[in-house]
Amino acid sequence: MLRYKAIVEYDGTNFVGWQRQQNGLSIQQLLEDKISTFTKQTVNLIAAGRTDAGVHALGQVVHFDLISPNNSKDLACINKETDNKEVSKQNNTTTTIDSLKMLPCRYNAYKLMSAVNYLLKPHRIILTSCEITTLQFHARFSAKARHYKYRIINRAVPSVIEQNRTWWIKTPLNVIDMIDASQHLIGKHDFTSFRSSACQAKSPLKTLTKIEVDTTNYPEIQIYFSAPSFLHHMVRNIVGTLVYIGLCKISPAAIKTILFAKNRAMAGPTAPSSGLYFVKVDY
């Protein structure tokens, strides 16, 4: 068995989300179908995060397994097209690239990536990297931290270029209040007030290690989030609440009351999915 790790970038606008669903085309379904087409094997993708409909990704991480060509033991394989370089096997021995030339090209990680990217056209999905990894690697459970960002366009008129990629807010936002309020959310808390009613997480306790409101490129506002894991809609619900604070509909001091209330109805609205990006995963 060979395990592959790939990084995926996608525009989530025209998809029902990451996960396979019966009511529309998902990113998982499309990727699995194209990988299977090239490899002639049934593939099951495991992702670091299951993004919702309309959410984008710059660095979604997935893994999948392929049966080895000899169907009996793991093989070392070329991860990229280079010459005269040693490649490590999963049993920590080494072999030269020359000895691997008989390996079918569909098991070569670089050629697999190139072929799948070709098959994905014209869909706005692309593999930005692909490599063979250890069987112990798991895209979801091996993750140490996940990073998201949310993009807001805060000006009088919407952006034609950034349509479906940002949240346009016409009224000027009080960014100072948004920054002040956001800092009360850093740390380990019960985030029930920012949790979707459909969330399946066993516990509402999460540790938010970073939340940063960046106005460097104003009128674009970017809000960055980092945590080992997130609740369903947690980032979008926090953004919606911060925007209400920026619009003076909620006072900055109220963020602590909202957090401790453990009541979703007290927080702001769920921000649109179009502004959310899954940036990267740390392992």
UniProtKB/Swiss-Prot annotation:
> What does UniProt list as catalytic?
52
Leading EC class: isomerase
The reply on keyword Isomerase is yes
Q: What GO biological process term is on the record, naming one?
A: tRNA pseudouridine synthesis
Q: Which reaction does it catalyse?
A: uridine(38/39/40) in tRNA = pseudouridine(38/39/40) in tRNA
Q: Which SUPFAM superfamilies match?
A: Pseudouridine synthase
- Binding sites annotated in the UniProt record for substrate: 148
Check the record and name the InterPro entries matching this protein. PsdUridine_synth_cat_dom_sf (IPR020103), PsdUridine_synth_TruA (IPR001406), PsdUridine_synth_TruA_a/b_dom (IPR020097), PsdUridine_synth_TruA_C (IPR020095), TruA/RsuA/RluB/E/F_N (IPR020094)
Offer an example of a GO molecular function term for this protein. Answer: tRNA pseudouridine(38-40) synthase activity
Q: Which UniProt keywords apply?
A: Isomerase, tRNA processing
What Pfam families does this protein map onto? PseudoU_synth_1 (PF01416)
EC code(s) of this entry:
5.4.99.12
Lineage, top-rank taxon, reads: Bacteria
Q: Does the keyword Oxidoreductase apply?
A: no
Q: Which family does it belong to?
A: Belongs to the tRNA pseudouridine synthase TruA family.
Q: How does it assemble?
A: Homodimer.
Functional summary from the UniProt entry: Formation of pseudouridine at positions 38, 39 and 40 in the anticodon stem and loop of transfer RNAs.
Q: Tell me what this protein is called.
A: tRNA pseudouridine synthase A
